[in-house]
Amino acid sequence: MADTTVDKLATEVGKSTDRLVEQFSQAGIKKSANDTVSESEKQQLLDFLKKQHGGDAAPTKMTLQRKSVSTLSVAGSGGQSKDVKVEVRKKRTFVKRDEAAEAELAAAAKAEEAKAAEVAKTAAEAKAKLDAEAKAKAKADAEAKAKAKVLTEKPVQESAEDKAAKAEEAKLLAAQDAAAKSKADEDVAAAAEVARRLAEENEKRWAEEEKARKEAEKTVDHHVTTSTEARAAEDTADANAEKRGRRPRKPSANAGNNANANAGAGKPGGKGKRGKDNRRDSRNSRNSRNNRSVAPESMDHAFTKPAAVVKADVSIGETVSVSELASKMSIKATEIIKQMMKMGSMVTINQVLDQETAQLVAEEMGHKVVLTRENELEHQVLADRNGDVLAESRAPVVTIMGHVDHGKTSLLDYIRRAKVASGEAGGITQHIGAYHVETENGMITFLDTPGHAAFTAMRARGAKATDIVILVVAADDGVMPQTIEAIQHAKAGGVPLIVAVNKMDKPEADPDRVKSELSQHGVMSEDWGGNNMFVNVSAKTGAGIDELLEGILLEAEVLELKAIKEGMAAGVVVESKLDKGRGPVATVLVQEGTLKQGDIVLCGLEYGKVRAMRDENGKAITEAGPSIPVEILGLSGVPSAGDEATVVRDERKAREVALYRQGKFRDVKLARQQKSKLENMFANMTEGEVEELNIVLKADVQGSLEAICDSLNALSTAEVKVNIIARGVGGLTETDATLAAASNAIMVGFNVRADAQARKVVESESVDLRYYSIIYQLIDEVRDAMSGLLAPEFKQEIIGLAEVRDVFKSPKIGAIAGCMVTEGTIKRSAPIRVLRDNIVIYEGELESLRRFKDDVSDVRNGMECGIGVKNYNDVRVGDQIEVFETVEIARTL
């Protein structure tokens, strides 16, 4: 390396030139800024700086100190606790190995190595000398043999004495050679043994010195020494405090234990325990001077590990999530998930379980289950009602259904005009939707056409507000689509049906035709051996009206309709609305008890105090009995048609129940089973059962309706069945939407549309509504939905075939097959098979696909490519690589 100047060296080390010149001067070297500096001068300056800054005196010992302060709560006199600050100081010293000792060990090792090398050298020299003597002897023997050969050729005859002398000489030479060789071998063996013993002694001595050094380092533990000395000082201080006490301490019952503890202090492992027991006893003795009732406290914890699984009583409500159930059972949620997987159910930690499933899981894991109801307050409020009150006969509630052109309204007008007091004027009060009439044989309550929709809603919620259905059919028109719809609603509600054949005054009336058409829909006349009563009436002349009313009362008598007349009322909401001037208005049909003004009413999600009551004529009333429709004001909101209205005692509890229902309303909707939509029909399939696809069908004309129904019914198989629960001609109405929501059905409109009220129900109830204008499209989509219930089939299709022409080795991938695509296309993402003599020897996937050193996604027929098979290197020339893909084939009907 070339010499550098002082100025350049100052720039390299980051110092000023004057400072560096001064340091050179202090080191005894006279330099200026432009003088050159040699390597020896640099080393001399560095040694001087090290000595000046203490570089030679490297630290041989390092001490670390740590201090921590904590607070300990200790019971004091008088049962009060006091806080004691505890300061813990830790000190640890690390000692560096002595460099002199290391140098001495290194020198000794070097000397031993030199000695062993000298011995080995001596042995090698002896062996070399022996080899030289052997070579010289061999040379002499060769010369002697040559000389003897020359002598033998001479014709002179040797004497017997010469031969004997030569033989003796040869014998002596052989003995000398053997002795010299054995001596050399002994010297070599002795030298090797000496070297081996020296090496073993050195290794043993070095191991002992290293072990002694490590033990010395372990003993120099100032932390242990400090803590031991601190405990000894504390014990001494406690003993001195006891000696300075006013009264001597009386011998206690545990004196023997203390003596044993002190006696065992000298044993190994008893040092720390002795100090701890002494300190605890001294604290107890100090406390005994202040308060004799203080018992010696134990610093050991009282927790014992349970020997078996803890069996607890698990309280389970109507619904509980997996995480909540795990918390109640004091286990991890994964244990519940494992248990449910064993039971055949795949759940997540946040999935909500119903009460029965949660009970089964908890009992399976060995816990006792206590079932609770979150709506206990609701049950208490509804149970706090009438006592043992005898039920009395009540008037029947009759709903009149039928086609709007079949004289239903005229029949209602005639019944009301004939049976209501003559002083009362006006027609039917349409806004209330219900009224009652008095006959000679009893009272009858009628629900008019708006009650039709309310009836469907009530059936959807499980209420039975209607007792009897009157089906009005025009004698000259026969059965119409809305008539069939009314029959379906009556059958779905499970109520008896009375047929009123109207317009008998017309000359073209044909009641037998009506009976024949109704019999095709399951409504059979009593004259034909059926169970349905047929009455011929005329709303224009009044013929047959009395027979109809008598038939209604007779059917009611057969049904034995009874209700409690006295006490707290209960009923059902027929219809409701929001009036601008009066607020929420609900029409309630009282089913039992007596509803009075001022009662607290709990109605579905709403509640309130009855501020006013009106009858069907709009007159204010103060009470209403069973089977009486009444209009009430004062609710907190508009209830839904079909909600149960119940009178309760406490308004505060009614408000709590209403708020609870409102909170649970969303949960109930989310927990409800998924509806039978076309997209998730397969998810709703249950094994071993015949699936049904419920459909509410509406079409524009009767011919299209019949054709669609026949085609859909023909699609039914042993596994999937089409169930058309309602059909008709005309637009989709609110009644159809409510029926579809109640039956988990699909609404299908063929060249028709839904009105505003129906769309509102569809949106609120999440009903699947579909429109079609081509009959084949409708049938195909329903067939696809039914096919979705069948398990799909999977088929493997070969998309490409490549022949291996050559095999190359790659350090990264392994064996690379140089192939020619003979059929189809080779794709990188598709699985492959390796064929040898048309036998599959490997099935896997491609690791690389290249063409001209470029990665490609596919290679077509007739092209060459390089293929790397993943995790397989036994590719040979002549093999075939087959590329295939799995295709899912949906089953069709």
From Swiss-Prot:
Which ranges carry the tr-type G domain?
Answer: 393-562
GO CC, alphabetical: cytosol
Compartmental location: Cytoplasm
Pfam families with a match to the protein in the record = EF-G_D2 (PF22042), GTP_EFTU (PF00009), GTP_EFTU_D2 (PF03144), IF-2 (PF11987), IF2_assoc (PF08364), IF2_N (PF04760)
User: Quick one: where's region G4?
Assistant: 502-505
Locate the region Disordered: 135-169, 201-300
Task: Check the UniProt entry and state the signal peptide residues, or none.
Answer: none
Region entry G3: which residue ranges? 448-451
- Care to name a GO molecular-function term for this sequence? GTP binding
**Which residues are listed for GTP binding in this entry?**
402-409, 448-452, 502-505
- Where are the annotated segments for G2? 427-431
Locate the compositionally biased regions of type Basic and acidic residues.
201-224
**Which keywords are on file for this protein?**
Cytoplasm, GTP-binding, Initiation factor, Nucleotide-binding, Protein biosynthesis
- Give me the ranges of the annotated region G5: 538-540
Query: What family is this?
Result: Belongs to the TRAFAC class translation factor GTPase superfamily. Classic translation factor GTPase family. IF-2 subfamily.
Q: What function does this protein fulfil?
A: One of the essential components for the initiation of protein synthesis. Protects formylmethionyl-tRNA from spontaneous hydrolysis and promotes its binding to the 30S ribosomal subunits. Also involved in the hydrolysis of GTP during the formation of the 70S ribosomal complex.
Report the protein name in the record.
Answer: Translation initiation factor IF-2
What organism is this sequence from?
Answer: Shewanella halifaxensis (strain HAW-EB4)
